[in-house]
Amino acid sequence: MLNIVLVCNWGASTGMLAKKIAKAAEEKGIESNVSAYSYDDLAEVINTASIVLLGPQLAYKLQEFEEKFGSTGVPFMIINTVDYGRMNGMNVLNAVLEKIKN
């Protein structure tokens, strides 16, 4: 199962995108769990994640998170700004699949 964790300041805007990503995964026949959290909650959920997606507004925290949680082996990815703004779940899912493939 693909467990995608989205993180933003409060989890609100990413909550909408999480639903779109889950729908895209369902359309592709991929079993997934897609959840959104505030970055303050990341330590509590990092060990359940296949990948952590950061909202574009948290791009400045990428290095901090990679250093803090690097030992988990969970990859991080910044969500494309255009896909985030348009709530394009399919594009984000495709980027996730590409990232975890490599």
Feature annotation, model-predicted:
Residues 2-11, 63-83:
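P-loop/Walker A phosphate-binding loop and immediately adjacent motor/lid segment at beta-alpha junctions
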Residues 2-39:
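Conserved active-site segments centered on acidic
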Residues 3, 75-102:
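Ser/Thr/Gly-rich flexible loops in soluble cytosolic domains mediating phosphotransfer, phosphorylation
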Residues 16, 62-65, 88:
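Short glycine-/acidic-enriched loop or helix-start segments at secondary-structure transitions
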Residues 19, 23, 67, 94, ...:
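Short, well-ordered alpha-helices that flank and scaffold nucleotide-derived cofactor binding pockets
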Residues 38-42, 61:
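Short acidic active-site motifs
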Residues 46-51:
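Short acidic/histidine-rich motifs immediately flanking catalytic phosphotransfer sites
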Residues 54-63:
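N-terminal glycine-rich "phosphate-gripper" loop used for MgATP/nucleotide binding
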